[in-house]
């Protein structure tokens, strides 16, 4: 929390000192403290639409994120997600966490847009900054771009962000369709599926950019919302299917390394030490056996401890 110098509100989850990539630990923390978390959100965030932001490969966000979204939806909130996929260079544990996280996230009904950043697309700090800039630019469209030819209002921005499924926002410099289409392919997000599923295309486009060209590139939406900009284009495509191909790559990485990791973990639990070095023990007089079940309760308790110690005698 100390790194969030400019955060308007901060809340420290009770007993939350990090989860060491343990998703189950994060879930228990949220369950135990949810009443306080919900009260904080209710008191400080009156917005109609909330986004829960988390890395899917860690422990805290990966475990708590989907659960928190589900709980907030149950409270009547409109909730979306901004989450991050681990790069192929990250650990197998990060990929396991991410895949389990998306298994839960994709089963939640009624979520708003899900923005899925991909650490395989570049430096993670740069990717985060790029997304924040693009998201803010999209929110500013109604105030920044007004034209007799067409406008986008706040309700259309909200309708776009409430669309269930994967979404992406791109910001392209240039005055023709090809540059916007290139931005929709080369960006900070997980690669889109090839099924061309899309609900809305909402964009402030320069005069030479054709909405029809964008539809040919990404798919036919239910509706489009367009404003007219100057020398830049800001485009949101939403209601897409989750990035199954990219998620399958993570699954395969785990599967390929499963046997090796299991063997390594089992090896640390085995010992090659010989147990017959102290031949002098064979010359010691035998201890008197104490019949099982005899004696007082205290004696039986000592017998139990003796059984444990006998493994080392």
Predicted regions and their residues:
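Tubulin/FtsZ superfamily GTPase core signature
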Residues: 1-313
């Amino acid at each position: 929390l100390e790194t969030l110098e400019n955060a308007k509100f901060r809340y420290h989850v009770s007993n939350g000192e990090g989860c060491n990539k343990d998703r189950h630990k994060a879930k228990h923390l949220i369950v135990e403290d949810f009443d306080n978390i919900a009260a904080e959100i209710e008191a400080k965030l009156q917005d109609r639409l909330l986004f829960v932001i988390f890395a899917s490969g860690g422990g805290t966000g990966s475990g708590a994120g989907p659960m928190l979204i589900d709980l907030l939806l149950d409270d009547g909130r409109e909730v979306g997600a901004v989450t991050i996929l681990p790069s192929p260079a990250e650990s197998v544990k990060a990929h396991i966490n991410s895949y389990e996280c998306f298994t839960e996230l994709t089963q939640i009904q009624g979520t708003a847009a899900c923005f899925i950043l991909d650490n395989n697309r570049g430096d993670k700090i740069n990717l985060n900054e790029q997304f924040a800039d693009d998201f803010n630019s999209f929110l500013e469209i109604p105030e920044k771009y007004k034209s007799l030819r067409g406008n986008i209002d706040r309700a259309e921005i909200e309708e776009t962000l409430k669309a269930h499924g994967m979404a992406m926002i791109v910001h392209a410099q240039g005055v023709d369709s090809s540059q916007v289409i290139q931005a929709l392919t080369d960006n900070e997000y997980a690669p889109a599926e090839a099924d061309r599923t899309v609900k809305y295309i909402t964009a402030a486009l320069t005069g030479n950019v054709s909405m029809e060209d964008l539809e040919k590139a990404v798919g036919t939406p239910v509706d489009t919302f367009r404003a007219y900009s100057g020398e830049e284009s800001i485009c949101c495509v939403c209601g897409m299917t989750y990035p199954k191909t990219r998620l399958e790559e993570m699954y395969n990485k785990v599967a390929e390394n499963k046997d090796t990791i299991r063997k390594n973990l089992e090896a640390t639990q085995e010992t090659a030490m010989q147990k017959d070095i102290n031949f002098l023990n064979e010359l010691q007089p035998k201890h008197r056996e104490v019949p099982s079940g005899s004696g007082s309760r205290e004696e039986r308790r000592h017998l139990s401890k003796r059984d444990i110690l006998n493994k080392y005698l």
